[in-house]
Amino acid sequence: MKTHQNHHLFGPIEHVGRIIKSAISKIRDFLIKLNHRFLLPFNRTKQKPDFSLAAAKEPKSRREVLKKLAFLPFFGGIAWTFFSSKESSASPIVPVPDSCGTFQRRTLEELEGNIPQGKLGNKSVSRLILGSNPFCGYAHSRDLKYTSSLFRAYFTREKLIETIHLAEQAGINTLNLCTWEQQHLINQYNKQNGSNLHTMMQVRPTKEDLYSDIDRSIDLGVDFIQIRGVEGDIFARDGNADLLQKCVDHTKRQGYPVSVGAHDVHTFYACDEAGIEVDFYFKTLHHDRYWSALPKKDRLPFGVQGPKNTNRNPYHDNMWCLFPGDTVSYIQKLNKPVVGFKVLAGGAIYPDEAFQYAFDNGADFICVGMCDFQIVENANAAIHAIEKANNRQRPWYG
């Protein structure tokens, strides 16, 4: 009789508790979905973006939304009491053991000096330049398929602002950009935060339209023009160095420093034959002492721009300075600033080693794509590499 009375007493309450628990779950799911609009990258938002540092710190992550909903379980407490005995067979949540390790990101307090600067045109530029390919999702990851989407998901508007601000605080004052949206972002960032970050735009001329990309970039306020390495290689490979000459001359007439980017040293051989005078050089610069580097027997002039191949040996996005010895020899003869890029070989070489190789072998600046948690470590690596390269063969330019 007592058992029947207890069942009669708590049955309705258990039913109410079940309803409350279901409602809580639905509310959480709805608010999380609603909050997704705050996690979209800058170039996907329709509202006018706020590029201030305060806006970047606003709580907009899903975790923070759930923290704000901490009060909801209180209202489901009664229901949970009656469910706990029925769900006791579920596996408990096990804390992550310390043996899994934790990531220790370096802070600004751990900077080990100031990044030296040099001159490009009439601007003082940090010898470590922030590359933007990761911001766009350009990940040279061999045959891994997920890395590009991972970068695009990671670099939300807030994360971009945070990364740029951290780079500025670490002494990086110049960015190499690959989209006009990024230039808009820097313009707003400089305006709202009283900063003076310089920008170098990768432009993409075509045979049909040589100048529009250059003119648009200048109109948006860039400081330097860099003809993208893809176009530099292809124009030179196809015997159209004269078109590169036109792009360089068009930029110079407007008073802007200009470079032809190149993945292949043969691009600069073609530019020299055409008499092209750039203001600075922008060249891939890394060694080939990593396991995924293309075998020497398979390296061909302009191979970086050749068709991608599924076979093991032909080029397949695994090396960007196919002739490092010839590249270093060429750089030694130059009397203008050289910016080395792809120095990490798409993440295959550690920064300490990569930066030292680049500066020892003639680079005056290096352009490196990086995430926020890599900036302080890379700044320190650049500072020390420059210090150790003081006895290098080529004088410093810029």
Where are these regions (language model features)?
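Catalytic alpha/beta core domains of metabolic enzymes, predominantly
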Residues: 261-355
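C-terminal segment of N-terminal export signals and the immediately downstream linker at the start
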Residues: 58-59, 80-126
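Conserved, mostly hydrophobic/aromatic
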Residues: 130, 258, 338
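C-terminal helical cap(s) of enzyme catalytic domains, especially alpha/beta-barrels
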Residues: 373-395
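Active-site-adjacent beta->alpha loops and helix N-cap segments on the catalytic face
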Residues: 181-191, 209-210, 233-247, 324-325, ...
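Glycine/proline-rich, positively charged
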Residues: 203-279, 306-310, 319, 334
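N-terminal secretory signal peptides
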Residues: 1-61
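N-terminal export signals
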Residues: 43-51, 55-58, 64-87
